[in-house]
């Protein structure tokens, strides 16, 4: 199964983590990867990493979909040019995936601010993927495999890149139905779980405390959950669970502790930070962002551009390598180890 890998913002750590990650894979597998990027950026990154004594793959060994730059990109200095380039890399990879040239895409981090400065109004890569593929409903799902127990943390966000004050208005039974359907389909088709157990977080502290700390649970979330359970009798839906205790069982399963709390096959978080705080606390190096609902696989490391360390040689490629491994696994290709050799 071939994959497209993007450089992300070339002023960030994307070029570095890509070259480091591919250096840890068997050379006979390199023919499966196509890089959407700029050769000059890769060559300069490789030369710098060699001077810094870092292990990286020579870009000459890679298959490149070249996008030339009009301006010089300096590591750690985000610009309109770097935003324009990162959007072009992503667009190329999407077009190639739509054409069936690759089974999936692994995207390095981009800067939303640079996209805005370059004239692109999309809030993130997920939204671009949905737009260019004509996909009405997609989900932002995070996967992390424990290096201790191999248990997989699976968390779907009901809402994504919106202000916290907009979350209650954005949450609707119809929207949750769409996300739940995507999650169940993913668990069955990609994780082979026919009767999954899915926990749904509450919105308010203590899930509203019977309406004393917020009305959303009482007025529509609990009724929606009851209706969803009737619609999916073969799936166990648990909730709304108070958010401050929901992921305790996940932590026990992650670290292999005796588990008085329950770990679930998947978690549905109602807003961005509610889901990503536990994900990043447990699985910052292992977590992968997966877009579900697309006609092809898309994964991404669960971190940003890290402009502050770009060019220093200290960026950790583990999450990018995990994103490659998950993309291969989910596209039913070869399974790579999820930890660096």
From Swiss-Prot:
Top-rank taxon, per record: Bacteria
Pfam families: PdxA
An example Gene Ontology biological process: pyridoxal phosphate biosynthetic process
Main location: cytoplasm
Pathway note: Cofactor biosynthesis; pyridoxine 5'-phosphate biosynthesis; pyridoxine 5'-phosphate from D-erythrose 4-phosphate: step 4/5
Enzyme Commission numbers on file: 1.1.1.262
Cofactor binding remark: Binds 1 divalent metal cation per subunit.
Binding site for a divalent metal cation: 161, 206, 272
Keyword RNA-binding: no
GO cellular component annotations of the record: cytoplasm
Reaction catalysis annotation: 4-(phosphooxy)-L-threonine + NAD(+) = 3-amino-2-oxopropyl phosphate + CO2 + NADH
HAMAP family reported for this sequence: PdxA
The family this protein is said to belong to: Belongs to the PdxA family.
Note in the entry: The active site is located at the dimer interface.
Subunit composition and interactions: Homodimer.
Protein name as catalogued: 4-hydroxythreonine-4-phosphate dehydrogenase
